[in-house]
Structures are given as C-alpha cells and as structure tokens.
Amino acid sequence: MTDVRSIDLFHVLVPLRKSIKHASFERASSDNLIVRVTLRDGTVGHGEGLPRPYVTGETIDSTFASLVKLDLPRTLEDVAGLESLVRRLVGFVLPEAQADPRGMAGNAARCALELALLDAFARREGRSVGEAIPWMGSFGEMLNARPGPVRYSGAITAESPGKEIRSALKMRIYGFAQVKVKVGVPGQDDPARLARLRRILGRGMDIRIDANEAWSAGEVVERVRPLLPSRPSVLEQPVPHEEAEALATLRPMLGVPVMLDESLCGYPDAERAVALGTADLLNVRLSKCGGIGPSLKIMDLARRSGLGVQLGCHPGETGLLSAAGRQVACRVRGIRFLEGSYDRHVLARNLIREDITFGYGGRARPLPGVGLGVNVDPDALAALTVAHREVRYD
C-alpha cells in the first residue's frame, strides 16, 4: 500500500513573451510536463519537468509513457512520511535511465515526479521541501545551516543589435552583477556583439558566453580567440556533445574556463568530465539531471573534484521549477552562477499564483511556506493543458 492515491500527468503549452533563440534551437512556447500527486488524505503536490529531445532525448509522449507504466505503489511501499520518502528516492531511477550509459533517459519525467512527491509529502507535514535537502545525501560542507538569500544572473539572447543594446542597458540599470550572452548563432558577428555589450555593461560586469554546441572541435579555438578581448569569464558548451572529449586537449588552448551543459545530463556525464578533464565548471539543471536529489549528487562530485557549478534553468520553466531551483540555491554553498526565476520576464502566462521573479540586481530570498513554497493556479493549469492522463492506485 502507498500513501499516493493518484497521479495526474499534464502536457502544458506555456507561451513565452518573446521568442528565445540560441545556436541549437529557437522557441516561442514551451512544452512542459506537470505531475500532480494526490495523497490518500487529499493532500496535493505538483512538480514539473521539461522534456527536450535534443537534451535528454525525451518528449512529452515518452514521459507520459514512462510514468503511466511505473509501478509507483511498489516503489513507495512502506513510505510513511517525508523523511522516508526522501530516503527511498535517493536510489530511485526510472528503468530507461538504468539502461542509459549517460544516466539521462527519463530525467525530465523523474524530476517532475520527484518534485510532486516532495511537494505533497512536505505539505502534509507542514514542512518546506528545502528542509528535506539534508536527508538526500552526505553533502557536509556543501549545505548552508540555514537558507540564505541568492543572486541570479541576467541573460542576453541572440537578437538584432538594437534589441541587444536595449537588453544590455536594462541589465546594467537593473544592477545585475553577472550576464550570460548567447554566441554562435549563424549570421551574427560575435566579436563585434561582445565588444559592444562589454562597453554597455561596463568593465566590472561578469560576462559569460554560451555557444550551445555551435562550433566543431576543429574550429573552436579560432572562433573563441577574437572573443577574448571582451574578457568573458566562462565559455559554455562550445562544441557538440559528440566532440566533447576533445575538450580535454582543447581546454588549455581556449584561454577561458569551459562549462559543460549539453554534455552534462546525468551522473555518468559528470564522472566522465572529471576523469577526462573536459571542464572547469558544470551546468546543473534540475530537469535534465533528474530532480533535486540527482542534481545535488552531481554538485557534490563537482565540489569534491575542484570544479565550479552553475545551477541553471531551461527556457520556459514555470514557477514550479523556479521554486524548486530556489529551494536548492538557498541551501547550497558556492554556486558560481545561478539562473532561473525569470518568470514574469519570460512567461506570457505562469502556472502559479505567486510572483517569485527575482528583484533588483537579480536578488531573491528563500521562499516561505510549505512544500515548494508556491501554489498552482488551477485555472491557468486548465487553460494551458494540451493533454491529460490520470493514473489511480486504488
């Protein structure tokens, strides 16, 4: 017997305020998976994942299929409360992930389910999901004794010069300390763009660049060299994942620290990056990495291996994943870069009632309240739902 009475799976189509463009993809809306867990006492929790075929190989259909066939009563047998749930989830992987050498198949589905379960069980006990983080592993020095304030980065996507200038001016006026700039989009003059943005953002701004697999291993050194005068702090995913092992040789030649993103989707990816020396930093995102527990495990490996960490986000995340990211960010020390909580700046409509968008300078505080700290707006969920499937465990 399990305390879970049912799960509901929702395919929601989230509209964006404007199209988001980078070297790998362009989107004006986001296909998101929402999982709703209902416990036998009526307590409800929600979670979110963003299946992306070009990231973890998942689609909405594959996540539905995975979660519908999951034997959740057996998985959660004898789980009675939040702490026992967390202990059980530590070793929980979907069958498709077990067969995947990169450990990423099913990660968006696992993330959505994990968050919904944590949200429901934490709400029932009047706790925050953040309180459960210390139970997810022996992370020691990585965790703060108490949740603290955080500061998010800004982001400038590849647009027309006029729009990029306006974005940069907004970033500077709004007091951001860090900004990410997308590079590698065909037809863009990246050296000129970056020099122009550096002039506007100022000498003190931390500017990192994200190529989204734009360049081949054979050309990356030449592509990066003219960008160095603008002093980027980090270069994210410069080559396709299939060529990422070449970074072990190329990384010392690039003149800028390298962060892995598309090549960092599961714990085996992180182990490989450490063993081969292909990265200086790892970009951990809850959805692509399988949820809070697996993400913390990767972050801990990075810390023990001397690598930096970015806690990132996927374009189109609603307030559910924003809240989950905040719960993690407020409790983990030493996060080099933090992305997320862009909600009202990116989404034309959100799924949650609260506005948890970061404030001036990207600053944000821990979320009060139980569960993830946010509440789903049922009208918004109904309006954005494209498909729905209920699984009952009577």
PLM features: residue spans?
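C-terminal extensions of enzymes
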Residues: 7, 345-394
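Structured beta-strand/loop patches that form or line metal/cofactor-binding pockets in enzymes
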Residues: 1-57, 344-349, 391
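Conserved, mostly hydrophobic/aromatic
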Residues: 35, 42, 113, 126, ...
